[in-house]
Regions:
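N-terminal amphipathic/hydrophobic targeting modules at extreme N-termini
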Residues: 4-8, 12-13
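C-terminal hydrophobic helical "lid"/dimerization subdomain
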Residues: 14-21, 269-273, 277, 315-364
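Short glycine-centered segments of the SAM/dcSAM-binding site in methyltransferase folds
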Residues: 100, 188, 279-280, 307
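Mid-domain Rossmann-like dinucleotide-binding core that forms the NAD(H)/NADP(H) cofactor-binding site
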Residues: 158-239
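Glycine-rich cofactor phosphate-binding loops and adjacent beta1-alpha1 units
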Residues: 181-182, 224, 229-305
């Protein structure tokens, strides 16, 4: 359960200067407003980050379209972002003004069992920028002392652009997922969904030595976009029986790893039938609450020794690893379809909903 976060303009948490910043504020589902808000002052022990690049995630789209029972309004969305340190508290000695930083959006308690073992994404008291706290669709963000102490700011390698650095969070989520399934060299991976996350999963799987990556997608635009940046087997789910096609590509064995990368994947595809004996099915995407319960053939799990594994979010350390991967040459720029300002953000949500684009980069 997410701890209740700071309300927008909640002066109990921060004091504000008179200078104004722009922010895209979700006032209720379907209503996004560009507001001028006071620039945040630096919290004791914390920092102020000038946000220079943010990416739009499908989770942001879902919040805009349908909201969330735990989301309090008004709220500044955005959890994939990077910028520069604009102000540092006198108590903070590790960071300095001008440092380029990628922001890990989760602030754990730092003391629970999960935080102590490096799984802060599972912290029961986790506060999330762009959900329980205001996020990255603004010109500035004040990060409290707890965020700084828990490693939310990662220094960006000099070889990376800010747009690339802002991609670290979704890339880290893919690293987390493949760590959970313990992907081995030469294994076959089937990825259901050819959007940005599916493409990132494909790139990481190839980088980690997967022998064959099979990407399954229905949308013709996304299939064309994926072809531009990936060297994988692409299946158009409109034109083939996906299970038969996967079996043909794997010599009748199926995939060692199956990954769900969109909300309806478990409803549209026979996940267990795609997996080889001893295979792992990674539930990376959740299922929309209004879709009900998905039936599972537990006998297939038992007799074929299948493993159903969940993965949620990522950790700050995984964001560091993602930055390192990109610095080593993992190319993600091709995923950016469009660059916009905050004023264009609502239109960008509509573009993302129509699947006409991959990643949209916001330059506040």
């Amino acid at each position: 359960m997410v701890k209740k976060g700071l309300r927008l303009l909640e002066t109990k948490a921060f004091s504000f200067s008179e200078v104004m910043m722009k922010a895209a504020v979700l006032e209720k589902p379907g209503k996004l407003a560009i507001r001028e808000l006071p620039d945040p002052s630096c919290p004791t022990g914390g920092v102020v980050v000038k946000i220079l690049r943010s990416h739009v995630c499908s989770t942001d789209l879902h919040m805009w379209e349908k909201g969330h029972p735990a989301l309090r309004y008004p709220r500044i969305l955005g959890h994939e972002f990077a910028g520069v340190v604009a102000e540092v508290s006198n108590e903070e000695k590790r960071l300095k003004v001008g440092d380029r930083v990628q922001v890990y959006p989760g602030i754990g308690c730092g003391s629970c069992e999960y935080c102590r073992r490096g799984s802060e994404n599972l912290c029961p008291s986790m506060r999330i920028l762009g959900f329980s706290l205001d996020g990255g669709f603004a010109q500035y963000l004040a990060l409290p002392k707890s965020g700084v102490e828990n490693g939310c700011l990662n220094i960006i390698p000099s070889s990376l652009s800010l747009s690339e650095a802002a991609m670290a969070e979704p890339l880290a989520c893919c690293l987390n997922g493949l760590e959970k399934v313990k992907l081995k060299k030469d294994e076959t991976v089937v990825i259901l969904g050819g959007g940005p996350i599916g493409c990132l999963f494909a790139m990481v799987a190839k980088h980690q030595g997967s022998g064959k990556v099979i990407l399954v997608e229905k949308d013709s635009v996304r299939i064309s976009q994926a072809r531009l940046g990936l060297e994988v087997d692409l299946l158009d789910a409109n034109n083939v029986d996906v299970v038969e096609a996967v079996m043909e590509l794997t010599g009748g064995l199926g995939a060692n790893v199956v990954v769900t990368c969109f909300r309806e994947a478990a409803l549209e595809y026979s996940l267990l039938e795609l997996a080889a004996p001893g295979g792992r099915v990674l539930m990376f995407s959740g299922i929309s609450a209004d879709k009900g319960v998905v039936p599972t053939d537990l006998n297939a799990v038992h007799y074929r020794e299948l493993a159903l594994i969940g993965a949620y979010g990522c950790t700050a350390v995984q964001c560091q690893r993602a930055l390192g991967l990109m610095a080593e040459g993992l190319e993600v720029n091709w995923l950016i379809s469009k660059r916009v300002t905050l004023h264009d953000l609502e239109e960008s949500f509509s573009n993302l909903a129509s699947k006409n684009v991959m990643k949209i980069c916001v330059e506040p």
